[in-house]
Amino acid sequence: LKAEEKKKQLEEFIRRFSANVAKSKQTTSRKKMLERLNVEEIRPSSRKYPGIIFTMEREPGNQILEVENLKAVDADGTVLFDHVNFNIEKGQKVVFLSRNPKAMTALFEIINGNRKADAGTYNWGITITTAYLPLDNTDFFNTDKNLVDWLSQYGPGNEVAMKGFLGRMLFKQEEVEKKVNVLSGGEKMRCMIARMQLQNANCLILDTPTNHLDLESIQAFNNNLVGFKGNILFSSHDHEFINTVADRIIELTPKGTIDKLMTYDDYIHDEQIKEQKAGMY
């Protein structure tokens, strides 16, 4: 890698993660690298990009998801959202926002059948198959299976195929025998993404998918979602990720939704929307 490219990579990392507390150590160390960046010091980057490719087995029909008058209340009685109505159109990639991040998790759990709504209904189209990436994946890893056996539960394919999948997600040959309950947060996330790829769903539900991922994984994930032909319903803290993937924004509030077909940048700078929001929380 030429010094220029390396410099660009470091700047991209710092720009993307300077506000992210979990990544602050990495950001600081990359700022230092940037400061002492001399051409002689640059060695080719050994960072690899995982092969993330989502494919749909079935073309979706026109009825994707219809939500009517949905309400969710937190365990402590806080209303997370109420009067939520929307209809997802074919091919839309929708980011859900709220001042309370628990609102998005509650919505995704409800439409995935893992939580009961406090009011209202939702209805999936008959051609829709979903793959869900939950915020908390702890329950998936309470087992002493190794990576190959763990992944084999979620899709057809022999051991060689599973090892190939794990290899694409950057697990080395000797790592696939590792027990899944000792994996790091980033490794678990890569396993969950591999699991989702096996499902060949035409609608992806992603609750804060960039948590625990490094820059290379986020970029690979990001690029594949941009080209994905199905529907995506997601939440994220990553500005760039939202801006490049979402073509519709639905904000969940205790007094209904704000629902706009626009980019995230336009949404957060729109004065009318700011005024509308002020009265909804």
What are these regions (language model features)?
Residues 1-82:
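Flexible nucleotide-interacting loop at or near the entrance of a catalytic core
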Residues 1, 57-281:
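ABC ATP-binding cassette signature C-motif
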